A protein has these predicted regions:
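Glycine-rich, basic loop-to-helix element that forms the pyrophosphate-binding segment
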Residues: 1-6
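Acidic donor-diphosphate engagement hotspot in glycosyltransferases and nucleotidyltransferases
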Residues: 7, 22-28, 95, 99, ...
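Short aromatic/hydrophobic "clamp" motif used to bind/position activated sugar donors
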Residues: 11
Length: 195
């Protein structure tokens, strides 16, 4: 409702338990804004030094959103963009995720990540405590935009990634296996470079 009457250049959404990292956030962020559609800063979990959704190591992609999200508590969005793509109020948990999918992935809006701490996240909210409902909403949203076969591919890639992340540390404990993995990796890179 507030979006309709917002008149500033950028806006940010926070839940009732979230708050700005410190009193200098807006001043610090204003130095980083150079006409980006979306600017994302760091968000810390309340009572810890843990960052939620750290910036991707490469350009943000569909797979990044499929596997996680962007923390809306640390995201400054151009007001005109938010008015063009209002949050879907029929969704209880994932309306921000749908917004990011629509704007960044399908409308190719520009996004910038910054190391500036923006917010402290209260992880006692509905999205933190109801992962199955969030998964259900995300799958519903994906089915609106993508064919089932594409969704199945993303699920398969996610399973492979989880398996790799689980097995690799275990396999690397043995020097022989670690050396073998290195040789195989080097060979695969050589084959790939020839193609």
């Amino acid at each position: 409702k507030g979006v309709k009457v917002a008149h500033g250049e950028y806006l940010i959404f926070m839940n009732s338990g979230d708050f700005f990292y410190d009193s200098d956030v807006l001043k610090n962020i204003s130095k980083e804004l150079y006409n980006e559609d979306v600017l994302v800063g760091k968000v810390f979990i309340y009572g810890t030094n843990n960052i939620i959704s750290p910036p991707p190591q490469r350009e943000l992609s569909m797979y990044h959103l499929f596997s996680g999200s962007i923390p809306h508590q640390g995201t400054f969005i151009k007001t005109t963009l938010q008015k063009k793509y209002p949050f879907d109020e029929a969704l209880r948990i994932s309306s921000d995720w749908k917004f990011f999918l629509q704007t960044i992935i399908f409308d190719n809006c520009n996004i910038k990540f910054t190391n500036i701490p923006v917010a402290i996240y209260d992880n006692n909210g509905i999205s933190s405590n109801n992962p199955s409902a969030m998964r259900f909403e995300k799958e519903h949203i994906l089915s609106e935009y993508l064919p089932k076969r594409v969704i199945l591919d993303y699920k398969y890639m996610k399973q492979c990634e989880c398996l790799t992340q689980t097995l690799t540390p275990q396999l690397r404990k043995s020097y022989r296996i670690d050396k073998l993995l290195y040789i195989i990796g080097k060979l695969l890179l050589k084959i790939n470079n020839r193609q």
